[in-house]
């Protein structure tokens, strides 16, 4: 069943697990995501309102919000909710299921399969995300989101690497999947 991206991010996020996002010759099965809510979520890029940088997050659901993280990594979110609400789902980790040689060339030779798209920056690099992909629809022509084949077990916990709204259980992942990023002190199981 297709995902309704006009729903709130915390509803869409677990539905994305097991789906495949394809772009730039690479398909990645999504294994870990984080929901970022509207302007009430202090950890969201939209917390202080609309800016030129985060404008895509205020667009219609089902579009990409691509930004540069730590000055070098391109990270991607799928915008959710009605237009103007500023919600999205951060793509944290996944398994490369097609175009592995392309993903490997983007990430560097010798990166183990499970780590090719492990972490938001690596996910973006393996997928070939560019700032020019900001606002692009996940329904084509340059992106394609495929429904999941089966519904995986899903675990919910706190988001990683944020300092605000840390108690919110808005990180979702497939337990025991080797591609889940985790971080010291955060569960992967």
Curated annotation (Swiss-Prot):
Documented EC number(s): 3.2.2.-
Entry keywords, A to Z: DNA damage, DNA repair, Hydrolase
Protein's UniProt keywords contain Protein biosynthesis: no
One Pfam short name: Pur_DNA_glyco
InterPro entries, per database record: Formyl_transferase-like_C_sf, MPG, MPG_sf
CDD domains on file: AAG
GO molecular function: alkylbase DNA N-glycosylase activity; DNA binding
Similarity remark: Belongs to the DNA glycosylase MPG family.
Protein name: Putative 3-methyladenine DNA glycosylase
């Amino acid at each position: 069943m297709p995902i309704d991206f006009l729903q709130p991010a915390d509803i869409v996020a677990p539905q994305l697990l097991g789906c495949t996002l394809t772009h730039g010759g690479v398909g990645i099965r999504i294994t870990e995501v984080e929901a970022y809510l509207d302007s009430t979520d202090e950890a969201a890029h939209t917390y202080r309102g609309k800016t030129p940088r985060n404008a895509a997050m205020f667009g219609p659901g089902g579009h990409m919000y691509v930004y540069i993280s730590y000055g070098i990594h391109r990270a991607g979110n799928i915008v959710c909710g009605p237009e103007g609400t500023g919600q999205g789902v951060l793509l944290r980790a996944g398994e490369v299921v097609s175009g592995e040689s392309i993903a490997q060339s983007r990430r560097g030779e010798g990166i183990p399969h499970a780590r090719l798209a492990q972490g938001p920056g690596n996910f973006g690099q393996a997928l070939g995300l560019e700032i020019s992909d900001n606002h692009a629809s996940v329904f084509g022509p340059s992106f394609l989101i495929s429904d999941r084949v089966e519904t995986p077990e899903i675990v919910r916990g706190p988001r990683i690497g944020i300092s605000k709204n840390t108690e919110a259980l808005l990180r979702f992942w497939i337990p025991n999947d080797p591609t889940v990023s985790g971080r010291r002190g955060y569960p992967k199981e």
